[in-house]
Swiss-Prot record:
Subcellular locations according to the entry: Secreted
Native species: Oxyuranus scutellatus scutellatus (Australian taipan)
Protein name listed in UniProt: Natriuretic peptide TNP-a
Matches recorded under PROSITE patterns: NATRIURETIC_PEPTIDE
Annotated SMART domains: NAT_PEP (SM00183)
Pfam families per the UniProt record, alphabetical: ANP
Keyword annotations of the record: Disulfide bond, Hypotensive agent, Secreted, Toxin, Vasoactive, Vasodilator
Tissue specificity statement from the Swiss-Prot or TrEMBL entry: Expressed by the venom gland.
GO MF annotation, one: hormone activity
């Protein structure tokens, strides 16, 4: 699930970078995957 979050925002797998995903960039993507 986290891996898809980073994909929609930075285009990179933030699956191991939970801190970066907490910026709120993955929050909207979490509900609706851009991919």
């Amino acid at each position: 699930s986290d891996s898809k979050i980073g994909d929609g925002c930075f285009g990179l797998p933030l699956d191991h970078i939970g801190s970066v995903s907490g910026l709120g960039c993955n929050r909207p993507v979490q509900n609706r995957p851009k991919k």
